[in-house]
Amino acid sequence: MLGAIAYTGNKQSLLPELKPHFPKYDRFVDLFCGGLSVSLNVNGPVLANDIQEPIIEMYKRLINVSWDDVLKVIKQYKLSKTSKEEFLKLREDYNKTRDPLLLYVLHFHGFSNMIRINDKGNFTTPFGKRTINKNSEKRFNHFKQNCDKIIFSSLHFKDVKILDGDFVYVDPPYLITVADYNKFWSEEEEKDLLNLLDSLNDRGIKFGLSNVLEHHGKENTLLKEWSKKYNVKHLNKKYVFNIYHSKEKNGTDEVYIFN
């Protein structure tokens, strides 16, 4: 159940629990595809969408890249767990060229493997004192073996054309959690998404939403009230990693909401 990259909040550990609730479909739409931990591990055809265009362009580039190509870049820049200056040079070169292969190599060496892109399109993740490991090539090969079924797009979720027969899986940024990738998500975006899901339900289109109702003392009252119209499955989950190194194990009510 690997994704293409190590991605904060990925669903690879939860997918076996989610998949029995996925209906039959003509096309699987992964509306916020992130690290592809879902898209790569379901039956195709798949539309994998994410508004983060640099990440989508990276996936498109990887389709025609070999692992040797990745190793050549690492060797060219002399990258290792201790090569901070070399990492900064690679980061500078990516920000000049926007070469998606360089972005892929950067993420192996950045802090917590995060891909952080600012408003100017520049990669800003600091050096992470890390490099490739045995799982890096494993993820790459899993991507190569499963990417043929996927069409990639980088649209805002409201602009994705949903067809009759689609199943729409939705794993958006979470309104009440503090992860870096959630900071641009607002209550207005949340309302727009929930309205979209209501409209899909009205059209007879199946959807599934991953989210949290409660997290470390915070409650998503908007989502909790909305969810009463649909089926709610409460999940048990340990996060793959937490960049804030929180010691708190409990207090998160992660749910799967579906029609």
UniProtKB/Swiss-Prot annotation:
UniProtKB keywords: DNA replication, DNA-binding, Host-virus interaction, Inhibition of host innate immune response by virus, Methyltransferase, Restriction-modification system evasion by virus, S-adenosyl-L-methionine, Transferase, Viral immunoevasion
EC number: 2.1.1.72
TM segment ranges: none
GO biological process: DNA replication; DNA restriction-modification system; methylation; mismatch repair; symbiont-mediated evasion of host restriction-modification system; symbiont-mediated suppression of host innate immune response
Domain of life, source organism: Viruses
Catalytic function, reaction form: a 2'-deoxyadenosine in DNA + S-adenosyl-L-methionine = an N(6)-methyl-2'-deoxyadenosine in DNA + S-adenosyl-L-homocysteine + H(+)
Enzyme's top EC category: transferase
Annotated positions binding S-adenosyl-L-methionine: Y7, K11, D50, D171
SUPFAM superfamilies: S-adenosyl-L-methionine-dependent methyltransferases
A Pfam family annotated for this UniProt entry: MethyltransfD12
One GO molecular-function entry: sequence-specific DNA binding
Main function: May prevent degradation of viral DNA by the host restriction-modification antiviral defense system.
Entry similarity comment: Belongs to the N(4)/N(6)-methyltransferase family.
Quaternary structure note: Monomer.
Name recorded for this polypeptide: DNA adenine methylase
